[in-house]
């Protein structure tokens, strides 16, 4: 089973559409449905892709901290936080990634996403974020 390596010069990431990316890093989405499985387990950066599922925004307004008529302009094309990928389980014809220990970044970090799971970003991109503490071994697993 693949695990994140805190001493590596790069950090694993996953690209997720909005609002799911925001929901994962807020701890409001614990199971994220995906079309393919992964053997990876451990800390992973959450990248907000360019896509936004507007119908999902309407369903999750409260979890996103939005007032009734407030506009939602999510971060796109940026690292918005990180979470621990705890498991990947079969869920009907899809897979569910099970997330834990979410950490939302105060400031989103611009980054290009990739389709591979995980994809890797330079550790230098996450300076000043909770991911830097993982790299230094100062954030619990």
Question: What is the predicted function of each stretch?
Answer:
Residues 2-141:
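Structured alpha/beta reader/binder surfaces that contact nucleic acids or chromatin modification marks
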């Amino acid at each position: 089973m693949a695990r994140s390596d805190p001493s590596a010069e790069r950090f694993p990431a996953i690209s997720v559409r909005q609002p799911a990316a925001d929901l994962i890093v807020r701890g409001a989405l614990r199971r994220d449905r995906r079309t393919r499985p992964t053997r990876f387990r451990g800390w992973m950066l959450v990248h907000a892709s360019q896509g936004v599922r507007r119908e999902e925004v309407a369903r999750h307004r409260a979890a996103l901290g939005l007032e009734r008529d407030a506009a939602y302009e999510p971060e796109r094309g940026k690292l918005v936080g990180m979470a621990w990928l705890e498991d990947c389980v079969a869920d009907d014809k899809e897979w569910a990634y099970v997330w834990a220990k979410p950490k939302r970044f105060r400031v989103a970090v611009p980054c290009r996403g990739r389709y591979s799971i995980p994809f890797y970003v330079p550790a230098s991109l996450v300076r000043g974020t909770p991911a830097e503490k993982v790299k230094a071994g100062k954030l619990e697993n």
